[in-house]
Amino acid sequence: MGVMINHHFLAFIFGILGNVISFLVFLAPVPTFYRIYKRKSTESFQSLPYQVSLFSCMLWLYYALIKKDAFLLITINSFGCVVETLYIAMFFAYATREKRISAMKLFIAMNVAFFSLILMVTHFVVKTPPLQVSVLGWICVAISVSVFAAPLMIVARVIKTKSVEYMPFTLSFFLTISAVMWFAYGLFLNDICIAIPNVVGFVLGLLQMVLYLVYRNSNEKPEKINSSEQQLKSIVVMSPLGVSEVHPVVTESVDPLSEAVHHEDLSKVTKVEEPSIENGKCYVEATRPETV
């Protein structure tokens, strides 16, 4: 009995630590969305990482609610649902019409339709509570592990370019620590569904830190990339319980005129005609493009 109490106490301690670190992880994109708010444009940012994170938080929150003894899992994923919803709402508000429609389609397909399907299957098809917990837990594991394609892509990019520009050591370190906290939480709760994704997260985080130490003094220049990638770099974020995100972070300032061409309606860009000479005088005419 004493061992069980000790295990629950340790689970509580690691759960608290996991909550603190994950709380900071969820707030990592705040500078991104402050930039979006100030510029009234989503620029080259995408909604996919935030929608995937919201979907993950919804699944883990549902899992924690039916499991009934995972309060610390409820707290962090409730916070995650609120924060990611705010991020997505701001993205909808400032995205172009085309990007907004695309993001809304993804939101309806993944966070409404797919989540509703999982909800109905686990609630109406699977009747017994223990089996519900087991089925939903393995669904969470499968989805959490599957999205590790993103950090693997960043690892491949670092090896290819021999540059750690896209993989800050500090972020990789704290995310690895987060994986350790949640792994220990799952271990002491004897919940393999919580522990497994964080084993993968720990291994990938450790790999990222090793690569950083190997390539941090490399003199290799990153290969040339397109203009949108020059403006932004991809930061891999392991969310609580093994879900990964790619948060774009500004790397350099963008020329206002080129930004207008890339992100704004063409009607906002004036067209300068070639100078003409008439009666010994030079004329330069600025005209707006014709609207259809």
From Swiss-Prot:
Cellular compartments annotated: Cell membrane; Golgi apparatus membrane
Domain (MtN3/slv): residue spans on this chain: 12-99, 135-219
Single GO cellular component term: plasma membrane
Regions of this protein lying in the Extracellular compartment: 1-8, 67-70, 127-134, 190-193
Transmembrane segments: 9-29, 46-66, 71-91, 106-126, 135-155, 169-189, 194-214
Superkingdom of the source species: Eukaryota
Tissue-specificity statement: Accumulates in leaves during senescence, in a SA-independent manner. Expressed in the lateral roots and in flowers. Expressed in developing seeds.
GO biological processes: cellular response to abscisic acid stimulus; cellular response to osmotic stress; cellular response to salicylic acid stimulus; embryo development ending in seed dormancy; leaf senescence; seed maturation; sucrose transport
UniProt record similarity statement: Belongs to the SWEET sugar transporter family.
Organism: Arabidopsis thaliana (Mouse-ear cress)
Membrane disposition: Multi-pass membrane protein
Gene assigned in the entry: SWEET15
Subunit field text: Forms heterooligomers with SWEET1, SWEET6, SWEET8, SWEET11 and SWEET17.
Molecular function in Gene Ontology: sucrose transmembrane transporter activity; sugar transmembrane transporter activity
Role description: Mediates both low-affinity uptake and efflux of sugar across the plasma membrane. Regulates cell viability under high salinity. Promotes senescence and sensitivity to salt stress. Contributes to seed filling by triggering sucrose efflux involved in the transfer of sugars from seed coat to embryos.
Keyword terms: Cell membrane, Developmental protein, Golgi apparatus, Membrane, Repeat, Sugar transport, Transmembrane, Transmembrane helix, Transport
Source species taxonomy: Eukaryota, Viridiplantae, Streptophyta, Embryophyta, Tracheophyta
Topology, Cytoplasmic side: 30-45, 92-105, 156-168, 215-292
Loss of function: phenotype: Reduced sensitivity to high salinity. In plants lacking SWEET11, SWEET12 and SWEET15, severe seed defects, which include retarded embryo development, reduced seed weight, and reduced starch and lipid content, causing a wrinkled seed phenotype. Altered sucrose efflux involved in the transfer of sugars from seed coat to embryos thus leading to starch accumulation in the seed coat but not in the embryo.
Cited InterPro entries: SWEET, SWEET_rpt
Protein name, as recorded: Bidirectional sugar transporter SWEET15
Induction section of the entry: Induced by the pathogenic bacteria P.syringae pv. tomato and the fungal pathogen B.cinerea, as well as by salicylic acid (SA) and abscisic acid (ABA). Induced by osmotic stresses (e.g. cold, high salinity, drought, mannitol, and sorbitol) via an abscisic acid-dependent pathway. Highly induced during senescence. Triggered by NAC072/RD26 during senescence.
